[in-house]
Amino acid sequence: DKIIEGYFDGEQMIATTGQAYAVPANYASKSKLVVGDSLKLTIGPRGRFIYKQVNPVERRRLVASLEQAPDGNYYAVHKHQRWRLLKASVSYFRAQPGDRIAIVLPRDLPANFAALENLIAE
């Protein structure tokens, strides 16, 4: 097995070599990965990719509003800030634009992406 370490950038793992590896959106969504989380990728002898979160960064939580941009991407909006969300997370929660959502962000790192933690029922 080949083992590669890196960090999550919101969509993919960036290895210490600088190479990017696609992280399955369902894994990132289910694991609530945030920008900066350390990941380990094991590539099996038959090409199977297995990701594992090895060192999560400190997190903070916010309540935001869900918006959908004209290009189809989803964003969490809080005051004058916005963070992109994985479509897999929005689909899983069956969230709709205008819904109030709970998001998770890295506490001490700038981020363009947020993890969708939950849908807040009105």
Please state what every model-predicted region is.
Residues 1-33, 38, 48-106, 114, ...:
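S1/OB-fold single-stranded RNA-binding interface
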Residues 42:
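Short metal-binding segments enriched for Cys and/or His
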Residues 120-122:
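Short acidic DE-rich linear segments
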